[in-house]
């Protein structure tokens, strides 16, 4: 029985992280816009933290309403111990294409998103060397990608520390095999943006 204790503790820890994730989603207003078990995305209505001009000319100012895209962790393809390989990338790409079609249809019919001109998400990868490949994959889907600004204030750095730690916990809970041999300090982030016009043009019905 004692040999099973580490596994039992790990299982309990993962269940706790999943429960915590569900609670934080509710508090943050993150919701499921699709009932498709293959949908990889959740959505929230948020406000931009930055001024940005997207590649199609769409201009977003800090404070403007935006759609916040979040991964639906329970639906993500499982990674192996080597992380996201080619097979995983193909499955993710196809899943994202289908999910973005559903997103386009949803926001065109929900009045809450009538004034939203762009959609934003934060992407985390296990090491900085993975950023170019991940960025290229998302750009093929129509996203603009951008390195986040490094916070200068201690409060910003403190926030980033906890965001990275929580992201690591989520990976441990939902994609545990992918963390073998990886170090949390090597976690890298970047932003992805897509304008409403680009989303509807590419993925609209």
Language model features by range: what are they?
Residues 1-95, 106-205:
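Non-catalytic substrate-recognition and accessory regions of acyl/acetyltransferase enzymes
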Residues 98-101:
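Transmembrane helical core of 7TM receptor-like proteins
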């Amino acid at each position: 029985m004692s040999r099973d204790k580490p596994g039992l503790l790990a299982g309990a820890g993962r269940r706790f992280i999943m429960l915590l994730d569900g609670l934080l989603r509710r508090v943050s207003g993150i919701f499921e816009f699709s009932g498709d078990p293959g949908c990889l995305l959740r959505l929230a209505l948020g406000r931009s933290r930055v001024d940005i001009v997207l590649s199609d000319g769409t201009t977003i100012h800090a404070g403007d309403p935006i759609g916040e895209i979040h991964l639906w962790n329970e639906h993500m393809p499982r990674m192996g111990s080597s992380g996201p390989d080619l097979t995983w990338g193909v499955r993710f790409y196809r899943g994202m294409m289908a999910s973005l079609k559903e997103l386009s249809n949803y926001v065109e019919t929900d009045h809450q998103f009538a004034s939203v001109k762009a959609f934003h998400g934060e992407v985390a990868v296990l090491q900085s060397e993975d950023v170019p490949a991940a960025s290229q994959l998302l750009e093929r889907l129509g996203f603009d990608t951008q390195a986040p600004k490094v916070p200068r204030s201690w409060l910003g750095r403190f926030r980033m520390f906890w965001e990275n730690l929580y992201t690591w916990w989520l990976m441990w809970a939902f994609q545990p095999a992918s963390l073998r041999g990886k170090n949390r300090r090597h976690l890298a982030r970047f932003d992805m943006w897509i304008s409403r016009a680009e989303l509807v043009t590419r993925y609209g019905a």
